[in-house]
Amino acid sequence: MAALDSDSDEDLVSYGTGLEPLEEGERPKKPIPLQDQTVRDEKGRYKRFHGAFSGGFSAGYFNTVGSKEGWTPSSFVSSRQNRADKSVLGPEDFMDEEDLSEFGIAPKSIVTTDDFASKTKDRIREKARQLAAATAPIPGATLLDDLITPAKLSVGFELLRKMGWKEGQGIGPRVKRRPRRQKPDPGVKIYGCALPPGGSEGSEDEDDDYLPENVTFAPKDVTPVDFTPKDNVHGLAYKGLDPHQALFGTSGEHFNLFSGGPEETGDLLGDIGVNKGRKLGISGQAFGVGALEEEDDDIYATETLSKYDTVLKDEEPGDGLYGWTAPRQYKSQKESEKDLCYVGKILDGFSLASKPLSSKKIYPPPELPRDYRPVHYFRPVVAATSENSHLLQVLSESAGKPTNDPGTRSRHQLNACKRGELLGETPIQGAPTSVLEFLSQKDKERLKEVKQATDLKAAQLRARSLAQSASGSRPQPLSPDVGHCSWHMALSGGMASTRTSNFKPFAKDPEKQKRYEEFLANMKRGQKDALERCLDPGMTEWERGRERDEFARAALLYASSHSTLSSRFTHAQEEDDSEQVEVPRDQENDVSDKQSAVKMKMFGKLTRDTFEWHPDKLLCKRFNVPDPYPDSTLVGLPRVKRDKYSVFNFLTIPETASSPVTQASSEKVAQHRASDKSRKPSRWDTSKEEKKEDSISEFLSLARSKVGPAKPEPSPLVNKEEARATESVSNKVVNKDVDSQTEGEGSRPSMDLFKAIFASSSDEKSSSSEDEQGDSEDDQEGTREADFKSSQETDLVEASSVAQASEPAPQEPAPFFPIQKMQIDEREAFGPRLPPVFCPNARQKLEAPLKEKHKKNKEKHKTKKEHRRKKEKKKKHRKHKHKGKQKNKKSEKSSSSESTDSSDSQSEEGPTDLSPQELLRRLKRLPLRRQ
C-alpha cells in the first residue's frame, strides 16, 4: 500500500503490512519453534491428520462436507409465473474453502490484469484481432482464442528472456536515451534559412540534463529491413494479394454462381457474403502445441480483406509496416475495357478475362547435319606404333580431323624425357632403364633396319589409301563413306601379313562369325565392297556401322598381336567362368519366343514376363500374407549363369587347335576327375598337401607304380607258367574289385583285415578284450596266415633276385598299371591306405576275412563256457605259432645269401609284425625298375 502524507514535505512510500505497536513494558513474543507449531483452521480449531485411507487432513466439519448437517441436495422450483433461472456453475462452486485457500488446489492468487500488462506487444496482431471481433458473426467471439490457444513461445523467445531481454525491447547493444545530433559537415553548403543552433526541442535537452552519463537503455524494437530481391512486375514496395491465400484460396476475383445480383454487391471483406452458413469467427488451435514446439500450418485458415487497411493514412510512429491496398480500385477501368474486347453475351457464371493469355514462343528444332549419328561413338585408342600407323591414319581420316604434329602435342602427352628434349636439356646418365640398352651395336642396327622397312611399308599403304580417298572426295567435309573406304584400303594392305585362320572373335554368334569370315574372304580377293556384301540387309544403319567397325578392328588389332601372345602365353587347362553372368532363371530360355512374338506383332500374353519371386519373410509378416515359399531360403529372383553379351566379345583371343599330346593328357585328366567324382568321399581321404607331406604314402605309391606294373624280361630263373598264373590272378582281382564297386560302395571291410595287416605280436598279447570276442576258427586263420606269409616271402625273394639279375630294358608299361591304381584308390575310399600288393595271393588274403566275418556272426551267441574254452585254445595256439615263427626265421637266415640282403630283411617278419617306420626303411632298399 502506498500512503501519501500531505503534511510532510517528503514523499514517503511504505510497502507491506506494519507491525502493531507494542505497549509500554510489554516484551516481544518469542517465535514458536517448528516442532511446537500446530495446524489449525481459519477458526483456530485443531486439524486432525487421518490415516492412509483418508489421505490428509479432515475434509470439512468433523469429517463432513462443510456443515454440521452435511451435504443436502439443492431444491429446484419452477412455475409458469416464476421461471427458475439457469444457474451457470463453475469449478469453484464444487470446491471447499480449503481448496480456495492459499495452500489449496485452486488458490486465489494475485494475477496481473491486462490493464497492467505491457502495452508494447505486437500491434499488428492486436489490430487484426479487433477487426476480426468487430466483423465476426458473433461479436467478441475472438476472445475465446485467448482462453483456448496456449502460449506460442519459441525456443529463441525463451533464450532471450533468460538472457535479460524483455518483451517490447529491441535486440542489440544498449544505448542512451536519445542519440546526439550529428553536427553538420562545415564543408557542406546550405541553401535557404539557417536552422537555430540549439535545436527546437529545448524541453528534451532539459530532460537529458537530469540523466546521468552512465545510464543506458535497451534499443528500440524496430522491424528489420527485408532484403528480399524483387522478382515481380509490381511497383516498388507494392505487395499484392496472393490468390492462393486471399479470398478463400480462389485465384482471381471471387464470384458467386448462385446469387442473382451483380458482382458489386459482393462483400469486400469476404467473411459472410460467400457462404451464409459458415461461421468464420473462431480459428486457431485448441491444444497440443507446447512452448518448445513449432506450430503446424493451419490448413483451415481463411484470408479476408478485413485484416488489411483499405484507407491510406499516415504511418503510426514505431510501426514500420505498410498497409495493403485494395485490388478492387481498378474495377472501373476494367469495366470500360470489357466492351472493347468482347462483343456478345457472356454466359452466366463466367466473366471475361482481364488479361489475354501469354502465348508461348515456339522455337524451331535445330537442323541436323548430314553425318549426324544419334548415338555417340567412342573411337578406339590405339598406341602409336609401327604396326598400327596405318590404323591411326584411318581413324584420323574417318573422324575428319588431321593428325596432330608431334611438336604441337599437349603437355599431358609428353613425358619428362621428351619435355627435356624440347627445352634443350642434357639428359642425365643413369642406370639403363630399358632392355634395348643392353643390346650390342650390331643388334641395334639390325633392329633399326627392320623398323625402317616396316615404316616404309606403312608409308606406302598410307599413301595408297590417301590417293584412293582423294580421288573420290569433294570440298565438303569427309562423310562416313569416305572413312569406311579408307578402312577397306588399310585392311586390304595389311591382310597379307596377318593369319586369321584360327582367330574367331565372334564364335558365340555363328551368323556374325560367318559374315566375318565372308568379309575376310572378300578382302583377300580385293573386292572394294566386301563389307557391304556380307552385312545383313535387315539391320539398321547404326548396327551396320557398328558391325563394320568391329570387323575392321578385329582384323587389324588382333591378327598382328596373335603371334606375340601365342609366344608368351599358353592355353588354359580349365574353362574360365568369367564369361557368364547371373540372370533370372525364368529369363534363360524365353528370348526366342518373345522375339518371334514381337516380329509377328502379337503383343499381350506372349510378350509378358512371369517371374518366380521369393519375398522376404519379414515382408510377408508386415503385409500379413502367407509366405508362398515357406521352405525357401532364397530372397528375390532365382538366378542361373549364362553368357554375357557385350559389343567387345571379340576381344578375347580364342584357343588354337591343341596338339594330340595335349588332347590325350586332357582326356586322361578328365577321366581321372570323373573317376574321383564317381566314387563316394570317405573320411580317410586326404588332401593333396597332406599326401605330399606324408612320406610313407609317398614311398608306397612309388613302390606301387614301379614294382607293381613292371614285367621283368623272361629269364631262366622265372617260370613262364608262374607268370601266367600271377597275371590271371591279378586280372581276376581287378575284375572283382570293379564289380564290387558297381554293386555297392557303402560296405566297408571288417576290422580283422586291418588287424591282420597292421597289428603286431605285442598288441595281440595285450588285447584281452579282443580275445574274448574270438571264435573257433582262429586255428584255421593262423594256418592261413602262416601259409600266406611264407608264400609272400618266397615270391618277394624271387622277385628281388630277378630284378637284380636282369638288366633294365626299355619296355612300355603294361596296361595293367592304371587298372591296378584305380583298384587301390577304390580300396582307400573305405579305410586307411593299404600296403602295396607284391604277390598274387592277395585275393586269398582278402577272401579270408569275409568268411571269418560270416562265421563270427554265427558264433556270437554262444555261452561263456565255450568262450573260456576258446580262450585256452588260443593261448596254446599262440605258443605254437610263436615257436613256428622263430623256426622259420632261423631257416630263412641260413638259406639266404649275402647278395639278397634286402629281400631277406623284408622276409624276416610278416606284414603283421612290421611297424610303419620299418616298412618304410625296407621299401627304400627295394630294387626298383628304371624306365
From Swiss-Prot:
GO molecular function: RNA binding
Keyword Acetylation: yes
Modified residues (Phosphoserine): 6, 8, 358, 479, 715
One Pfam match: G-patch
GO biological process: mRNA processing
Residues with N-acetylalanine modification: 2
Keywords, ordered alphabetically: Acetylation, Isopeptide bond, Phosphoprotein, Ubl conjugation
Record's compositionally biased regions (Basic and acidic residues): 582-593, 669-695, 781-792
Comp. bias intervals (Low complexity): 896-905
Ranges annotated as biased composition (Basic residues): 852-888, 922-931
Crosslinked residue numbers (Glycyl lysine isopeptide (Lys-Gly) (interchain with G-Cter in SUMO2)): 313
GO terms under cellular component: nucleus
Polar residues bias spans: 72-81, 659-668
G-patch domain boundaries: 152-198
Protein's name according to its UniProt entry: G patch domain-containing protein 1
Naturally occurring in which organism (per UniProt): Bos taurus
Taxonomic classification: Eukaryota, Metazoa, Chordata, Craniata, Vertebrata
